[in-house]
């Protein structure tokens, strides 16, 4: 016997969260809970404003229609990426095919005063990998901050993300201030320039490895080995079903590329599932999941070690 529930939720964000020049005051999304006999599976559907093509209202409409079809015996996945991902997670939990083991290691997102960051990063246990957003300020400033961190902590490796912010000139201004001796400790720089060709040229000219992120979701993208390209950053909420995520990871690994499972600012429930997906598909790579502290609460499932308050399922709005 099948049953299901859909929950709508909204989490207040910290004041400083800006995405694509838009301040994100709340994170809005949906959960689907599927039950069959004694088994239960959950999934999160939370399109990311400015990045997802669909709104959460559109996702809600598609999700509710899919749930009704599922209750009637139809299991075909929807095409909308955020819904396909959430539904496929719920089905995988229901079928017990999403492993419980999770990779809760994170590459901490660095912002704020560089002196404070140096102290924090120097105390990190184990492999020191951190992430820095670049492209929000002047490229010269970004280069100086990155150089300072790499100089101060000799065993630190940085993942950088420019979100296609730079022209070729700005990319060169950034690189000018990063000591060539430190550049090999930049694990990768996600999408430095506005076009893929400019990003490729940046990698060739600077020796700084790049990663594809937004490019993966463009219709003309193909997985090929290229000089200077070291990684792909896969955001399942923006990608689609678990099967599509797995196909992308396998395509990357076949070319010797690092595949990084990364957050689209999901709630704690979604983040814990991403940690399980990372342990399953990319066990040797630290995922990019350090976004929970951008929110003011956890929901339904806790992230280990987080002190944020937890909103239980009974407090969420039911849609069925």
UniProtKB/Swiss-Prot annotation:
Q: A Pfam family in this protein?
A: MenC_N
Q: Which Gene3D superfamilies match?
A: Enolase-like C-terminal domain, Enolase-like, N-terminal domain
Q: Which UniProt keywords apply?
A: Lyase, Magnesium, Menaquinone biosynthesis, Metal-binding
Q: Which residues form the active site?
A: 133, 235
- Pathway in which this enzyme or protein is active: Quinol/quinone metabolism; 1,4-dihydroxy-2-naphthoate biosynthesis; 1,4-dihydroxy-2-naphthoate from chorismate: step 4/7; Quinol/quinone metabolism; menaquinone biosynthesis
Catalytic function, reaction form: (1R,6R)-6-hydroxy-2-succinyl-cyclohexa-2,4-diene-1-carboxylate = 2-succinylbenzoate + H2O
Q: Does the keyword Magnesium apply?
A: yes
CDD domains listed in its UniProt record: OSBS
Task: Look up keyword Magnesium and say if it applies.
Answer: yes
| GO function terms (MF aspect) | magnesium ion binding; O-succinylbenzoate synthase activity
Which PANTHER family has this protein been placed in?
O-SUCCINYLBENZOATE SYNTHASE, O-SUCCINYLBENZOATE SYNTHASE-RELATED
What's the stated role of this polypeptide? Answer: Converts 2-succinyl-6-hydroxy-2,4-cyclohexadiene-1-carboxylate (SHCHC) to 2-succinylbenzoate (OSB).
Family per similarity comment: Belongs to the mandelate racemase/muconate lactonizing enzyme family. MenC type 1 subfamily.
Q: What is this protein called?
A: o-succinylbenzoate synthase
Q: Which organism is it from?
A: Escherichia coli O157:H7
